[in-house]
Amino acid sequence: KRTKEEKKNPMAEVDTSTIDINQIPFYYGSHYSNPTYVSHFLTRLFPFASISIEIHGDKFDDPNRMFYSMQKTFETASSLKDDVRELIPEFYTIPEMFKNINNLNLAQDKLDTEGQAIIIDDVQLPPWSKNKPINFVVELRKNLEKNQKINKWVDLIFG
């Protein structure tokens, strides 16, 4: 796991002895957004539910890997070196992505270690949102719009 300091300075842990001086430096060894990440976040909505099922061999992904909690997603992205997912634009525009409006059986009747049914339904949102997706989306958008350093992120990602 990475410390908060290492997350702030990802190049701090790069082994410089293996760097090719002719190679342009980069932060991400894999892409931060791809169809699998998008369907991961949007799996409660069609056509992304169908795409997710197709990606995972005619079933939804394992419940332990599904997007079910903003807190868990934040913890994973903040601590795992190889988790480079970014929030997709829909986080700022589509509150329905956090609700299981299609009543999908996302856990596919799987059982936990105690034999209890695993239930994955709506995404667990932070307490400040009062578990209302519209509150969550509006607050994310407000924070994005007031961020004075968004241009640095754009430069980092797109050059």
For each feature predicted by the language model, list its residue ranges.
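Long, non-catalytic protein-protein interaction scaffolds
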Residues: 1-159
